[in-house]
Amino acid sequence: MARRPGSSSRGPARSDRLPTEAVTSARKPHAAAPTPPASPDPGLVLLGEFGRPHGLHGEVRLKSHTSEPLAIAGYGPLHASDGRTLELANVRPAAGSSPDLLIVRVKGVDDRTGAEALNRVTLAIARERLGEVEDEDEFFLTDLIGLTVEDGAGTVIGTIVAVPNFGGGDLLEIRPAAGGPTALLPFTKAFVPSLDIAGGKVVADPPDDLFAPPGPKPADDPG
C-alpha cells in the first residue's frame, strides 16, 4: 500500500480481514534492488517476484513487496504472471541483510526444475480481495493507473499508464494527451502536489520539457 507523497504513516489496520496495510509497492527499495512496477492489470496488486532456485528440492527465492515480508504467505492462492495459480508454503527469511528476500516452497513444486521455471514470475492478488483502504491518505499504486494528469491550471496533459520503480523511488509513466512517447515523472510531493483518486485525476507540476524529444547525441558519443 502506498501513501500520498509527504503524508505520515498510521497504525495497523483491523485484523478481521486481509491485512491491506501489508501490501505495498511503494516501500523504499534497498540499493541495487529495484522493485517491479505496479501490476499493469488494474484489477491486480503485485505482492512479489520469484528469483533463483534454492537447493535441489523445489525451494526458490522470493522478493516480497508486502510491508511485513512474511505476510505474503497468508493470502492463499495467488495469480502468477505465467498464468498459473500458485500458493506458497514453508516461507522463511533468506540469509543476508535484505528483509524482503525470502526462501519459499510453492505447493506442487518439488524439484529444482520446477523452481527454475518460477524465476522472474510475479505474484499478484485480486484487488477486490483487499477491500477498501480506511485512511484517505492510503491507496494501492495500481489505483493510479488510468488517472488523468492535469497541470496547475487544470489543463489535461496526459494519463498515467504505469508506476515503475527502478530503485530510486516510484515514478509515474505518463502518456501525453497530445500523443507521442510516454515520459516518467517522479512520484513526489514536489512533482505531484495533489492526488484525487476518487475524482480520477492527479495534479502535477512537471518540468517544461517533460515530453520533449531527446536531443541529438554529442558528436563524440560512441552510442
Swiss-Prot record:
- Where is this chain compositionally biased, Low complexity type? 1-12
Keywords linked to the UniProt accession: Chaperone, Cytoplasm, Ribosome biogenesis, rRNA processing
Q: PRC barrel domain: from which residue to which, for each copy?
A: 135-210
SUPFAM superfamilies attached to this UniProt entry: PRC-barrel domain, Translation proteins
| Presence of the UniProt keyword Plastid in the record | no
Q: Name one Pfam family in it.
A: PRC_RimM
Q: Name one GO biological process term.
A: ribosomal small subunit biogenesis
Gene Ontology terms: cellular component: cytoplasm; ribosome
Recorded GO molecular functions are: ribosome binding
Annotated spans, Disordered: 1-44, 203-223
InterPro entries on file: PRC_barrel-like_sf, PRC_RimM, RimM, RimM_N, RimM_N_sf, Transl_B-barrel_sf
Locations listed in the record: Cytoplasm
Where mainly found?
Answer: cytoplasm
Function according to Swiss-Prot or TrEMBL: An accessory protein needed during the final step in the assembly of 30S ribosomal subunit, possibly for assembly of the head region. Essential for efficient processing of 16S rRNA. May be needed both before and after RbfA during the maturation of 16S rRNA. It has affinity for free ribosomal 30S subunits but not for 70S ribosomes.
Stated family: Belongs to the RimM family.
PANTHER family assigned to the protein according to its UniProt record, in alphabetical order = RIBOSOME MATURATION FACTOR RIMM
User: What is said about the domains?
Assistant: The PRC barrel domain binds ribosomal protein uS19.
Q: How does it assemble?
A: Binds ribosomal protein uS19.
The name under which this protein is listed is Ribosome maturation factor RimM
GN (gene name): rimM
